[in-house]
From Swiss-Prot:
Assembly and binders: UreD, UreF and UreG form a complex that acts as a GTP-hydrolysis-dependent molecular chaperone, activating the urease apoprotein by helping to assemble the nickel containing metallocenter of UreC. The UreE protein probably delivers the nickel.
Chaperone as UniProt keyword: yes
Protein name per its UniProtKB record: Urease accessory protein UreF 1
PANTHER family documented for this protein: UREASE ACCESSORY PROTEIN F
Top-rank taxon, per record: Bacteria
Keyword Protein transport: no
Cited InterPro entries: UreF, UreF_sf
Major subcellular location class: cytoplasm
Record keywords: Chaperone, Cytoplasm, Nickel insertion, Virulence
Length: 228
């Protein structure tokens, strides 16, 4: 039996959908990716909670997290306006700076679209079968009428939480350190989500070159826990 899931104007329903879609248990395989953090830990660039917090906040403010938020916002707008999503999908894929970053965003994007079909929506017919993760999240959120600012804040928080989970497995910090970082990052996530909501494609760009290099170096790391 197919259940038609309508666009929501109810804040509680929107919140519930975001919590489901961006939950660590949503089947996108995010637990298997470290976004280059594993290599940064291996090379001694991130050794404690303070360094981890700094690493994450710059990824969000000026790195891949920021670019993904801009792409997510543009995909949301295209979905809301009924515009074509293939161009933004192609751009998002092209912006993946290394083989593992490409794998990370494309596999998660495809898995997200497959799982999100439990909430039927016409947006799935307008998306390419292979789609980068931020485009998938933004388009589905827009297709369901989830408010943009909320979608971006949840997306960025999920990005950080996944890397915080990875940091525990990498013995950078423990659960108490992770919760402290989560609390400390709230202003960063809120401010970045607000900026991304007002962004355009001209705002794409990052300056976290070391993080990008770590993602590349991870490809040849002999012993590792994560796929990226």
């Amino acid at each position: 039996m197919i259940i038609i899931t309508p666009i929501t104007n109810d804040p509680t329903t929107a919140l519930l959908r975001l919590m489901a879609w961006l939950s660590p248990v949503f089947p996108v395989g995010s637990f298997s990716y470290s976004h280059g953090l594993e290599r940064a830990v291996h090379d001694g660039l991130v050794v404690d909670a303070a360094g981890l917090q700094d690493w994450l906040q710059w990824l969000v403010r000026r790195g891949s997290g920021w670019n993904d938020a801009v792409l997510c916002a543009e995909s949301w707008r295209c979905a809301m306006k009924g515009e074509d999503l293939h161009e933004i999908a192609e751009l998002a894929e092209a912006l993946a700076g290394s083989r593992e970053r490409h794998m990370e965003t494309m596999l998660q994007g495809g898995a997200f679209l497959a799982a999100a079909r439990s909430w039927p929506c016409e947006i799935f017919d307008r998306l390419p079968p292979d789609c980068a993760y931020p485009v998938a999240v933004g388009a589905v959120a827009g297709g369901h009428g989830v408010p943009l600012a909320q979608a971006l804040a949840a997306f960025l928080q999920a990005f950080c939480i996944n890397l915080l989970q990875a940091s525990i497995r990498l013995s950078v910090t423990g659960q108490s350190g992770v919760t402290a970082i989560m609390a400390a990052l709230e202003p960063v996530l809120g401010e970045t989500a607000a900026r991304a909501a007002l962004s355009s494609m001209e705002d794409l760009g990052s300056a976290t070159f070391i993080a990008d290099i770590m993602a590349m170096k991870h490809e040849t790391q002999h012993s590792r826990l994560f796929r990226s």
